[in-house]
């Protein structure tokens, strides 16, 4: 699965709970983005509600087989609740149901600063064969 397909599928799965990005020009868009580690949102962009951040590059997990090398792609997502109104366990559950073999872990966040809660979700997609 490529990055665009994954992003589209996740947005479709979580559409009813996604928050909103408000861009510097006032336009709004669903709060789902693809970023490299350490990359931030464009200047002037604000977030409200549930944000989903997909890490741009997947981790490759090798599967050893006779005469074929395969690798699962493990995509990392961060669910970030900026409003404190979402149950991240329920949101992560929707993703785990849609992508069997995936897992989710809560991340501690400082109280009173930034997001209310955060989870990391690792989604594993089908292997690609490399001969």
Give residue ranges: language-model regions:
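Functionally constrained cores in energy, signaling, and assembly domains
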Residues: 49-51, 73-75, 81, 99-100
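Oligomerization/assembly interface segments of phage tail-like spikes and tubes
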Residues: 67-84, 117-131
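Small/polar-rich, solvent-exposed N-terminal microdomains that initiate assembly or binding
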Residues: 1-65, 85-89, 112-116
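Generic preference for well-ordered secondary structure
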Residues: 38, 61, 79, 105-107
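Acidic-leaning, charged glycine-interspersed low-complexity segments
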Residues: 20-23, 89-131
């Amino acid at each position: 699965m490529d990055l665009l397909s994954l992003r589209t599928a996740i947005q479709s799965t979580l559409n009813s709970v996604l928050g909103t990005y408000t861009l510097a020009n006032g336009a709004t868009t669903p709060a789902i983005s693809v970023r490299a580690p350490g990359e931030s949102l464009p200047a002037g962009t604000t977030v409200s509600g549930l944000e989903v951040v997909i890490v741009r590059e997947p981790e490759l997990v090798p599967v050893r087989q006779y005469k074929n090398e395969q690798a699962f792609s493990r995509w990392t997502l961060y669910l970030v609740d900026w409003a404190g109104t979402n149950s991240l366990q329920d949101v992560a559950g929707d993703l785990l149901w849609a992508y069997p073999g995936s897992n989710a872990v809560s991340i501690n966040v400082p109280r009173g600063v930034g997001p209310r809660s955060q989870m990391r979700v690792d989604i594993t997609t089908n292997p690609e064969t490399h001969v």
